[in-house]
UniProtKB/Swiss-Prot annotation:
Regulates the biosynthesis of dolichol phosphate-mannose. Essential for the ER localization and stable expression of dpm1. It comes from Schizosaccharomyces pombe (strain 972 / ATCC 24843). Coiled coil: none annotated. This is Dolichol phosphate-mannose biosynthesis regulatory protein. Pfam families: DPM2 (PF07297). The gene is dpm2. The keyword DNA damage does not apply.
Length: 72
């Protein structure tokens, strides 16, 4: 299931970024995609959120590890 969602998201984004800039603005297929500014904003926001999650996870592991060492 997740493979299909990932593939669909990849294809949508690829078409949106690589093909749609060359399609005429009056074409009906332009209505299927968001504005071009979102093509950069969405991936950057997802990447920042992922970096924050990874940083939080690593920080919690380091805090847990230091508590175990201090208890010994």
């Amino acid at each position: 299931m997740i493979v299909y969602i990932s593939t669909a998201a990849f294809l949508y984004y690829t078409i949106w970024v690589l093909i749609m800039p060359f399609v005429d603005n009056m074409n009906i297929s332009q209505k299927l995609f968001l504005d071009r500014e979102w093509a950069i904003t969405i991936p950057v926001a997802v990447m920042l959120f992922g970096i924050c999650l990874i940083g939080t996870f690593v920080s919690l592991l380091m805090i847990k590890s230091s508590k175990k060492k201090s208890d010994l």
